């Protein structure tokens, strides 16, 4: 049996569903709401987290039912991955798709999310709950430098 991790052996298309799911580092970026300018299609990043996101752990409170509970919940698939060009350069799906290695803090490499939180990769230090926000425009952040 090979000691080489699956993400170094397989393309995204070759991964099982379990392998695909395990690539997600749980940073929470997908769970922050984005606003889209209707005239220009420009994406505005906010720090407003979906109410299903547990901000402290950066995990979905209702992962199995997320699409029922949140109609705008994002589902990354092999087929639509390239349409999410706002994903951060740290995103494992993006990294593997570009033939790059995972970072040392990624839970598959480090064994836990502690290193991610320590490096401030997760959104827990910036996120606010959607249900607590009155005016989303007050929560627009500058477009991250990594956004294409």
Curated annotation (Swiss-Prot):
Lineage of the organism: Bacteria, Pseudomonadati, Pseudomonadota, Gammaproteobacteria, Enterobacterales
NCBIfam families the UniProt entry points to: PRK05170.1-1, PRK05170.1-5, PRK05170.2-5
Organism: Serratia proteamaculans (strain 568)
Family: Belongs to the UPF0260 family.
InterPro entries with a match to the protein in the record: Puta_zinc/iron-chelating_dom, UCP006173
Name of this chain's protein: UPF0260 protein Spro_2751
HAMAP family xref list: UPF0260 (MF_00676)
């Amino acid at each position: 049996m090979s000691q080489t991790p699956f993400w170094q052996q397989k393309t995204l298309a070759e991964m099982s569903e379990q392998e695909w799911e395990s690539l997600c580092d749980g940073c929470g970026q997908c769970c922050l709401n984005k606003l889209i300018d209707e005239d220009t299609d420009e994406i505005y990043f906010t720090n407003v987290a979906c109410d299903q996101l547990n901000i402290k752990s950066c995990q979905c409170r209702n992962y199995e039912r997320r699409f029922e509970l949140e109609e705008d919940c994002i589902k990354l698939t092999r087929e639509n991955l390239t349409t999410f060009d706002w994903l951060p350069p740290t995103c494992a799906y993006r990294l593997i798709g570009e033939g790059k290695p995972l970072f040392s803090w990624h839970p598959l490499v480090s064994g836990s999310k502690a290193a991610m939180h320590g490096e401030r990769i997760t959104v827990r230090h910036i996120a606010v709950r959607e249900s607590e926000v009155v005016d989303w425009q007050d929560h627009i952040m500058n477009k991250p430098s990594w956004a294409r």
